[in-house]
Amino acid sequence: MDTHNKDDSIIRFSVSLQQNLLDELDNRIIKNGYSSRSELVRDLIREKLVEDNWAEDNPNDESKIAVLVVIYDHHQRELNQRMIDIQHASGTHVLCTTHIHMDEHNCLETIILQGNSFEIQRLQLEIGGLRGVKFAKLTKASSFEYNE
């Protein structure tokens, strides 16, 4: 199988599935509004590629991108400053933050990060472990290239 095809054309290939797996695939297509099986399969492959890219343990690979979503009690004493200190002290590049007031007690902050997977995940654990943090979820992405 030639995996280094430089042509941007779409390649057709077939996949053999058990009927119950195909039924589940078709249900997901309908549920999520995909226009075809191919669209869903492409998304699943992209997700797996990102997951595998994050699993590669290369401390010099700074191509990882992630969004950390944090919900916290803004009345918690010095929490905001501790979150900022952790961001400044980490080996991760903080590219952007967005802060919104959810209600009179809770804030939501998104932090866009770039760096190696270890440093990004460590930052998530440090912030997530702070007293007053109610939710800290990391959405992983990668800047590796694939053709559409």
From Swiss-Prot:
* Cofactor binding description: Binds 1 nickel ion per subunit.
Q: Which UniProt keywords apply?
A: DNA-binding, Metal-binding, Nickel, Transcription, Transcription regulation
Biological process (GO) annotations held by this record are: response to nickel cation
- Cofactor(s) needed by this chain: Ni(2+)
The UniProt annotation places Ni(2+) binding at H88, H99, H101, C107
Q: Which Pfam families match?
A: NikR_C, RHH_1
Gene Ontology molecular function: any one: nickel cation binding
Q: Which CDD domains match?
A: RHH_NikR_HicB-like
Please give the superkingdom of this protein's source. Answer: Bacteria
Q: Is Cell membrane included in the keywords of this UniProt record? A: no
Which PANTHER family is this protein grouped with?
NICKEL-RESPONSIVE REGULATOR
Functional note: Transcriptional regulator.
What NCBIfam families does the entry give? PRK00630.1, PRK01002.1, PRK02967.1, PRK04460.1
Q: Could you say which protein family the record assigns here? A: Belongs to the transcriptional regulatory CopG/NikR family.
Name listed for the protein in its UniProt record = Putative nickel-responsive regulator
